[in-house]
């Protein structure tokens, strides 16, 4: 069974639509929705604010496990379906394979730094914080490079492997995180610079805070500029350097 829908969150002028597709490995018995406590078992569509959602019922046996996988897109339901097929199609319904893949992807990042000495607790704290230092960078483009810009237009990235990121404002990352990212993962740092230049290409300005791939009034400083300069100073320059200078100067 496959269900699809969308949501429109609004916050700090960062309005955007999230489309999603959800697929389960067993046919459902029934489907329903609820809005602020009112349950409707006859409708597959619901509108409203606050407490709103949908549910599926199944005939199950004791101990039976039902698996569900989802994908999202900020472009369309069709794009969400494409993301689901590309990102999870190779795994089928093998949960352990998906988990192993996720573990290996994070291991690639965390293993860029090896520490010596200290206790197991010290190591656990270090790698937990290293993990957290990467968590606020969120990919907003689809597997084929499509995304919705700050003017609600669908754009196409030249290289889908270098995605557009919606994230916080790189707030005070010049104190330590810029250096960490550049030294530990220069390839990821380069992608972040490319993402900022994509904002400049389609919007005309670098974003102070790009949550939801929007221009946000969250702060008045330009903390993205020290990140771009830090990348350049460390030899991370696999992007249009002249365009980067133009964007920073503007």
Question: Which positions does each model-derived feature cover?
Answer:
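Aromatic-rich carbohydrate-recognition surfaces in CAZymes
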Residues: 166-250
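Beta-sandwich/jelly-roll carbohydrate-recognition scaffolds of carbohydrate-active enzymes
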Residues: 1-165
């Amino acid at each position: 069974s496959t269900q699809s829908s969308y949501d429109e969150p609004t916050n700090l002028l960062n309005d955007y639509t999230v489309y999603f597709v959800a697929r389960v490995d067993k046919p459902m018995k029934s489907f329903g929705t609820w809005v602020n406590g009112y349950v409707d078992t006859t409708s597959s569509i619901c509108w409203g604010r606050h407490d709103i959602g949908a549910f599926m019922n199944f005939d199950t046996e004791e101990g039976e496990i039902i698996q569900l996988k989802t994908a999202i897109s900020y472009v369309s339901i069709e794009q969400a379906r494409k993301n689901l097929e590309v990102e999870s199609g190779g795994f089928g319904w093998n949960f352990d394979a998906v988990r192993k893949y996720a573990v290996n992807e994070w291991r690639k990042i965390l293993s860029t730094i090896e520490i010596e000495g200290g206790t197991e607790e010290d190591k656990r704290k270090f790698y937990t914080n290293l993990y957290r230092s990467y968590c606020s960078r969120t990919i907003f483009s689809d597997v084929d490079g499509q995304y919705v810009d700050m003017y609600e237009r669908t754009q196409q990235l030249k290289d889908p492997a270098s995605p557009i990121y919606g994230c916080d404002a790189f707030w005070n990352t010049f104190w330590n995180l810029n250096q960490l990212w550049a030294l530990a993962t220069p390839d990821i740092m380069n992608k972040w610079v490319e993402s900022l230049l994509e904002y400049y290409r389609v919007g005309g300005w670098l974003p102070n805070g790009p949550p939801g791939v929007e221009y946000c009034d969250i702060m008045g400083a330009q903390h993205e500029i020290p990140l771009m300069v830090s990348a350049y100073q460390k030899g991370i320059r696999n992007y249009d350097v002249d365009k980067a200078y133009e964007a920073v100067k503007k």
